Amino acid sequence: MGTVYINNVVKQMKTDLRLIQEQQPLIHNITNYVAMNFVANSLLAIGASPIMARAEEEVEEISSKSNALALNLGVPESTTAHSMILAGEAAMKKRIPIVFDVVGVGATRFRMDIASQIILRCHPTVIKGNASEIQALYSHQIGMLGVDSHQETYEVEEQAKKLAKQLSCIIVVTGAIDFITDGERMAYVHEGHSMMSKVTAMGCTATGIVGAFLAVNSDPLEASFHAMKAMGIAGERAASQSRGNGSMMINFLDELCNLMADD
């Protein structure tokens, strides 16, 4: 196993961003209601084309025409879960990359059951969660009290590696330092700011951004690494000029728009 050391990671991230701007990939998001507006605006900010369809009557058709699918467990409902599975199976058949955010997966048996079905039937390309969510998914233990992790990322690195191998996917563990692995390779993202955790939908936005990078980069670990790097850089820059949560949200969108500005 080895850590991914990339001297020109920002340059490579910008190569992906340039491809996103040129190709304007269609990213199908089935995310929670709280996050939909911010996720869509963030994807537009980097040049992607978001669509937020969730009706089971159309999700298969839309996913089949999309360049990536982003699924989110944030506000689980039986109808939404069914839509996610239908969309995921359609994407899988077309070999369209899928990123699945296992929000609060350890909080209830309902969430764990939905997550297990999506993983079993849709085989996500990337699974994303904070430390406690990834630990819960690995152990199938219920009892996590919230969706914010108070564990350090390093505590679940070994579990993330094992889970990545077991599920043949990329695992993204978010935290003060983000950890990305395919079970063999590892990458760390040190950028970011604590203010990001005070703005709702930041995590859901990261999931959508990962989807956009997956649409243009065929290496899912590299795509996830670059996406989280972009989130972190934009977050740091936004925080440096923000007075509170409101300005942080607006500044973050502006900084996503301006990630290519220093070229």
PLM regions with names:
Residues Q159-A164, P220-G235, L253:
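Short, well-structured alpha-helical segments that form the helix of a local strand-helix-strand
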Residues M112-M186:
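Conserved phosphate/ATP/ADP-binding segment of small-molecule kinases
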Residues A136, T200-K229:
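Short, small-residue alpha-helix embedded
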